[in-house]
From Swiss-Prot:
A GO CC term attached to the entry: NADH dehydrogenase complex
Superkingdom as given in the UniProt entry: Bacteria
Swiss-Prot/TrEMBL catalytic activity: a quinone + NADH + 5 H(+)(in) = a quinol + NAD(+) + 4 H(+)(out)
Record's subunit section: NDH-1 is composed of 14 different subunits. Subunits NuoA, H, J, K, L, M, N constitute the membrane sector of the complex.
Enzyme Commission (EC) number: 7.1.1.-
Name this protein carries in UniProt: NADH-quinone oxidoreductase subunit K
Membrane topology category: Multi-pass membrane protein
Keyword tags: Cell membrane, Membrane, NAD, Quinone, Translocase, Transmembrane, Transmembrane helix, Transport, Ubiquinone
Family: Belongs to the complex I subunit 4L family.
Length: 100
């Protein structure tokens, strides 16, 4: 059995990579992927804590987080496609206004 601390360490590492992706990258698609990485690392931590306590409530919360993340991706990608059609770029620095 893998110790709980390894899962928490992996979750922290993945969350750190996600934060670095949000802070360093300027591409909107990479920003979305970095946010999803952070959400999934939080899910890993929640499942790990639920497994350590032998409680199913953490897994239920993770299910709802996955549902909300899927809705966020659907709306975010739809907005990104609409912005790309008008601006012809996905660079966040160049997409500074919502006017056409």
């Amino acid at each position: 059995m893998v110790p709980t601390s390894y899962y928490i360490l992996l979750s922290a590492l993945l969350f750190t990579l996600g934060v670095a992706g949000v802070l360093i990258r300027r591409n909107a698609l990479v920003l979305f992927m970095s946010v999803e990485l952070m959400l999934n690392s939080a899910n890993l931590a929640l499942v790990t804590f639920a497994m350590a306590r032998q409680d199913i409530a953490g897994q239920i919360v993770v299910f709802f987080v996955i549902v909300v993340a899927a809705a966020e991706v659907a709306v975010g990608l739809a907005l990104l496609v609409a912005i790309f059609r008008t601006k012809q770029t996905t660079d966040v620095d160049e997409i500074h206004s919502l006017k056409g």
